[in-house]
Amino acid sequence: HGFAEFHRYFLTELDYDGLIVDVRFNGGGHVSPLLLSKLARKRIGYSLTRWMGEGSYPDDSVAGPMITLTNEHAGSDGDIFSHSFKLMGLGKLIGRRTWGEVIGIWPRNSLVDGTLTTQPEFSFWFKDVGWGVENYGTDVDLEVNNLPKEHRKNIDTQLNKAIELIQKDVKK
């Protein structure tokens, strides 16, 4: 339900002065290209109609700067999204270096007892680091830790830092 949730809320968040995308704990999937295609739309203008009001150009484009939160629990498509967001220059990546697990599996072989086996079948290459995300992850632009003592007090240091930085970016 990740893409459906993103798409539902994305349309309500477009007109804010800044956008924070949180992919912490993203264990994978296949939605990063869909998310990135939406986030990559840079607002460059507006249309104004006589009766329906103002619209962004291009449609459904982000109004301001973006920051993505990631952490060491973002793997597979979480790694791919984080690295792509950074590589595409969509905004700052903050939190912790990602997990580094981008080898894809295909669970298609069953044993006689019904056990399903998986084997690595897909790898991922980026134009800036080649195969370098696998077994390493993606470095963040700014490392921010959520310490256990803060977590116990319901303090999200990474999110607080993202809010602080996006507010500074909006003022520029």
Label the predicted regions.
Residues 1-112, 151-155, 164-169:
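Cleft-lining beta-strand/loop regions that shape enzyme active-site pockets
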Residues 16, 46, 126-172:
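In a subset of proteins, long, contiguous C-terminal domains/tails are tracked
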